[in-house]
């Protein structure tokens, strides 16, 4: 099937030329190109047109889940009749296994999986396995992490057709081999049930149920039915059932893996004994032998991913399979906000290796654990065929890779100009900012304020609230779903000012924002670099009254670069508008959640409603000892639930900061609070 781009818009401004240049480059085999597009110039629309022109399966890579979700929704809107998929980490919470030798503390892996995202991941892989060419996968850096290989997953696909001679029990055994679980009572995703000559399969990658009926030993009908009403949605002559999990294996592979694990265990025990490390030798022997027993009896064990090399048949050091292996060789990669995404890819391997070093060195894991990892950057680079780096501020790496093939997109379809930048002294900056906020609020416009620290963001929010300004804050401690709610509330006018730390930059689409205030703009560093300042200033580029105020006592080199580049772009935009008699038009955009949803027969299944975050002053986090407080015993159910929610956020942040001891304490605290709640 061909890509069918659906949009009420036509390419305008710089878009037609950008689309033409990028399309020609791909058709001519150019390996790397840069799309340097200013904020609000319609880079996603340009990329969508290029995809439609070149007809290649495409991986769109973003640096975080929120922006990936936004891109997914946009691509889904542009290509409603094609396979637009979403592939990000399915962990709501993930605390990796770790050992801290300084305190002799071992922390077990702990996680919570989001079933909806797991379904979307399986759907993405299933679309690629199907062989169809009209596939767009929007992904985070999860795409470079290990998973089952294409050969094993292809071997687990069950192909059936109406009229086929097939023993029903043989079919059931195939389902089990593809990791579907029989459950005749509660038909959940990834389960199947048997009623007489009918088998219902709740496919792991879909909201609906596949119903297969037999007449004697022949398949009589294949239907997709609604998972609630069981009304027929569609009938099929033939159908492919894809595995229920991205990690599948055969009995023979398992037996071979166990033999190899046993051999490596003997070798590792001998190594520790030669070093005089009897405790480590005993530890690794007990742990691995227990894991092998679990694999023999149940087919899996806790931490089985650390043995993935054996099941995949890989050699030590050989890269793992990942999502990129499922694309054909001539696929297209689009790296969004490449100045952030590329360094993130580069950093993944080192962090993973550092954590596992202690686990292997102290006898908690075999050296094979090192091979359950993300791709090294050079491995990732080798798997690229053709790539478009998309950014308003491309880094030196992307410019070198493109060898000068840079396509500029400076003109916005709306005629909007880059915002004016004004530098004001930092003395009395808060009072001056307050006046600007009052002026914007009176015009029903919004304001973004960016600070240097989280604490400053929270304290400034508290100050604004005390002066009757409707304000809120956002930073990395705020949960992803809550961030979406906060952004939507800002756009809807629930509050007028959003104060941020390091999240008011790439990809935020807030056309109601007419002022961006950058406090302490002259404090050189990562948050006040040329690229950071340009990205932050770009948040005001979607409003016809857009303006940026930098509060600073001196003009740094980074500030000057941003001011000069903005002035250059404004002059080009002003000339284009004058030549074409264009009056800048305010962007009007509907407010909706940017998180992906899955479809059901009755319509769209919305994302869970997030908790409304109330602005509050900064409070240093307390150690996890809440349950020891006698007041907890007198808490109501609502108060206990709120405490659980707050402690869960602290746990996630501790895990993200690699403070595993604190995260484990928070986890235990949550368990005890939950017990207290259950007893009410």
What are the roles of these predicted feature ranges?
Residues 87-98, 109-120, 451-456, 472-488, ...:
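Conserved helicase motor
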Residues 69-77, 97-99, 459-463:
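Short amphipathic alpha-helical segment within the helicase RecA-like ATPase core
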Residues 34, 87-432, 436-442, 461, ...:
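N-terminal cationic and glycine-rich segments that engage phosphates or anionic surfaces
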């Amino acid at each position: 099937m061909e890509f069918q781009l659906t949009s009420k818009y036509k390419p305008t401004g710089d878009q037609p030329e950008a689309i033409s240049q990028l399309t020609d480059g791909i058709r001519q085999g150019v390996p790397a190109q840069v799309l340097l597009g200013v904020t609000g110039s319609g880079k996603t629309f340009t990329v969508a047109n290029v995809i439609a022109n070149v007809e290649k399966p495409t991986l769109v890579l973003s640096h975080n889940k929120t922006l990936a979700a936004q891109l997914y929704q946009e691509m889904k809107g542009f290509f409603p009749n094609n396979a637009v998929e979403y592939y990000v980490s399915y962990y709501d919470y993930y605390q990796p296994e770790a050992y801290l030798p300084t305190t002799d503390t071992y922390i077990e892996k702990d996680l919570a999986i989001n079933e909806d995202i797991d379904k979307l991941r399986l759907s993405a892989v299933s679309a690629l396995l199907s062989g169809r060419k009209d596939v767009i996968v929007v992904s985070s850096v999860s795409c470079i992490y290990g998973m089952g290989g294409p050969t094993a997953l292809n071997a687990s696909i069950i192909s059936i057709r109406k009229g086929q001679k097939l023993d029903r029990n043989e079919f059931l055994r195939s389902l089990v081999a593809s990791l579907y679980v029989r459950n005749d009572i509660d038909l959940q995703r990834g389960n199947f049930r048997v009623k007489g000559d009918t088998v219902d399969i709740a496919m792991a990658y879909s909201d609906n149920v596949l119903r297969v009926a037999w007449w004697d030993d022949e398949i009589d009908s294949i239907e997709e039915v609604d998972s609630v009403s069981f009304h027929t949605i569609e009938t099929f002559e033939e159908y492919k059932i894809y595995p229920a999990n991205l990690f599948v294996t055969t009995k023979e592979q398992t037996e071979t893996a166990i033999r190899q694990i046993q051999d490596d265990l003997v070798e590792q025990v001998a190594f520790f004994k030669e070093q005089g490390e009897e405790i480590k030798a005993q530890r690794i022997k007990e742990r691995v032998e227990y894991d092998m027993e679990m694999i023999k009896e149940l087919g899996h064990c806790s931490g089985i991913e650390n043995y993935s090399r054996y099941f995949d048949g890989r050699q030590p050091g050989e890269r793992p399979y990942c999502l990129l292996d499922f694309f054909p060789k001539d696929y297209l990669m689009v790296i969004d906000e490449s100045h952030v995404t590329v360094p993130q890819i580069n950093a993944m391997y080192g962090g993973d290796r550092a954590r596992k070093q202690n686990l292997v060195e102290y006898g908690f894991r075999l050296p094979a654990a090192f091979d359950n990892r993300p791709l090294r950057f050079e491995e990732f680079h080798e798997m690229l065929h053709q790539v478009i780096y998309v950014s308003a501020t491309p880094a030196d790496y992307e410019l070198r890779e493109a060898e000068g093939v840079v396509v500029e997109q400076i003109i916005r379809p709306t005629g909007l100009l880059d915002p004016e930048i004004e530098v004001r002294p930092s003395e009395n900056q808060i009072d001056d900012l307050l006046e600007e906020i009052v002026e914007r609020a009176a015009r029903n416009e919004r304001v973004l304020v960016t600070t240097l620290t989280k604490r400053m963001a929270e304290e400034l929010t508290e100050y604004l609230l005390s002066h009757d300004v409707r304000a809120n804050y956002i930073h990395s401690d705020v949960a992803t779903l809550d961030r979406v709610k906060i952004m939507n509330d800002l756009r809807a006018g629930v509050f007028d000012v959003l104060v941020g730390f390091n999240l008011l930059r790439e990809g935020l689409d807030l056309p109601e924002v007419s002022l961006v205030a950058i406090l302490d703009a002259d404090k050189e560093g990562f948050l006040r670099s040329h690229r950071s300042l340009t990205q932050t200033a770009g948040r005001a580029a979607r409003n016809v009254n857009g303006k940026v105020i930098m509060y600073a006592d001196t003009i740094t080199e980074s500030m000057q670069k941003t001011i000069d580049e903005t002035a250059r772009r404004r002059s080009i935009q002003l000339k284009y508008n004058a030549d074409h008699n264009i009056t800048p038009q305010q962007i009007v955009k509907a407010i909706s959640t940017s998180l992906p949803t899955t479809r059901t027969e009755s319509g769209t299944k919305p994302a869970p409603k997030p908790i409304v975050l109330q602005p509050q002053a900064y409070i240093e986090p307390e150690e996890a000892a809440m349950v020891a407080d006698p007041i907890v015993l007198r808490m109501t159910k609502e108060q206990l639930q709120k405490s659980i929610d707050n402690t869960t956020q602290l746990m996630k942040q501790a895990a993200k900061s690699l403070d595993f001891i604190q995260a484990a304490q928070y986890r235990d605290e949550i368990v005890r609070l939950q017990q207290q709640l259950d007893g009410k």
